């Protein structure tokens, strides 16, 4: 019953008009009025921001803020996979040969997430990792490894919450939400970086258009907090053992080791 009511309320409020109004407000000068309150409520680390709080003219500018030079370091070990974002480590685990994985008691289909069987097949038996970005986090997304970009594509139309309630009561938000996917071939092995849109503000802006990408290079940004899913081929990585669900991650921090490079 609780799940049914939750989904009904989300459907009633999560329309194109609502998203349009919220997006327009966030991009307007009027939104600057609530920037101080927003920064206080979400405890934004102002010492790391590229500009002072009063220099951001709109909420959108604050959402998509850059960091001061040198505030994040990228692990340079050739064998390392690094966190592509600042966020909370939600979960990781095996992708079944059926091209599915379980998180928070919910089964997700890689076929649904990536849009077709052919794309999903290369990740059967592989590993998934999920990182959640809250409204307080730095919202820019960087590459977790170096390689050649093989494909970029967008799927889904609407987005549902990806917070704790959304993950428990929502309808597979990680594979159903609006999402932007970048696939990278690194030394013959594939990784998919799935950028999952957040409810209401359904926007993911791509910044990287070249055919190659370097580890730590900026690729895109969310206009609000959301979630990143990483998919790796079978026998490609070993997740850092110390990583725990709920742990805070910083951009550039090592989260896994390339098995072929050990």
Swiss-Prot record:
It is found in: Cell membrane. It is an enzyme of class 4 (lyase). The modification Pyruvic acid (Ser) is found at residue 226. Belongs to the phosphatidylserine decarboxylase family. PSD-B subfamily. Prokaryotic type I sub-subfamily. The keyword Lyase applies. It is a peripheral membrane protein. It catalyses: a 1,2-diacyl-sn-glycero-3-phospho-L-serine + H(+) = a 1,2-diacyl-sn-glycero-3-phosphoethanolamine + CO2. It comes from the Bacteria. The active site is at residues 86, 142, 226. Transmembrane segments: none annotated. The keyword Lipid metabolism applies. Its EC number is 4.1.1.65. Its cofactor is pyruvate. It holds the Pfam family PS_Dcarbxylase. GO terms for biological process: phosphatidylethanolamine biosynthetic process. GO terms for molecular function: phosphatidylserine decarboxylase activity. Keywords: Cell membrane, Decarboxylase, Lipid biosynthesis, Lipid metabolism, Lyase, Membrane, Phospholipid biosynthesis, Phospholipid metabolism, Pyruvate, Zymogen. Heterodimer of a large membrane-associated beta subunit and a small pyruvoyl-containing alpha subunit. The lineage of its organism: Bacteria, Bacillati, Bacillota, Bacilli, Bacillales. This is Phosphatidylserine decarboxylase proenzyme. The record marks 225-226 as: Cleavage (non-hydrolytic). Binds 1 pyruvoyl group covalently per subunit. Catalyzes the formation of phosphatidylethanolamine (PtdEtn) from phosphatidylserine (PtdSer). Pathway: Phospholipid metabolism; phosphatidylethanolamine biosynthesis; phosphatidylethanolamine from CDP-diacylglycerol: step 2/2.
């Amino acid at each position: 019953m609780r799940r049914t009511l939750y989904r009904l309320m989300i459907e009633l409020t999560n329309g194109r008009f609502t998203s349009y109004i919220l997006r327009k407000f966030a991009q307007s000068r009027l939104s600057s009025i609530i920037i101080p309150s927003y920064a206080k409520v979400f405890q934004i680390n102002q010492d790391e921001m590229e500009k002072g709080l009063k220099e951001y003219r709109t909420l959108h500018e604050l959402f998509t803020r850059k960091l001061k030079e040198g505030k994040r370091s990228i692990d340079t070990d050739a064998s390392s996979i690094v966190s592509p974002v600042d966020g909370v480590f939600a979960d990781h685990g095996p992708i079944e040969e059926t091209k599915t994985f379980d998180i928070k008691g919910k089964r997700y289909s890689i076929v649904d997430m990536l849009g077709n069987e052919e794309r999903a097949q290369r990740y059967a038996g592989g590993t998934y990792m999920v990182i959640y970005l809250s409204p307080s986090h730095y919202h820019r997304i960087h590459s977790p490894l170096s390689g050649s970009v093989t494909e970029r594509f967008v799927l889904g139309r609407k987005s549902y919450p990806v917070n704790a309630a959304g993950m428990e009561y929502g309808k597979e938000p990680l594979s159903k939400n609006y999402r932007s996917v970048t696939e990278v071939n690194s030394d013959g092995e594939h990784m998919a970086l799935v950028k999952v849109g957040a409810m209401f503000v359904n926007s993911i802006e791509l910044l990287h258009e070249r055919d190659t990408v370097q580890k730590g290079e900026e690729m895109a940004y969310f206009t609000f907090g959301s979630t990143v899913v990483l998919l790796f081929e079978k026998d490609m990585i070993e997740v850092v053992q110390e990583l725990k669900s709920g742990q805070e991650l910083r951009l550039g921090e090592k989260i896994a080791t390339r098995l072929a490079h050990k």
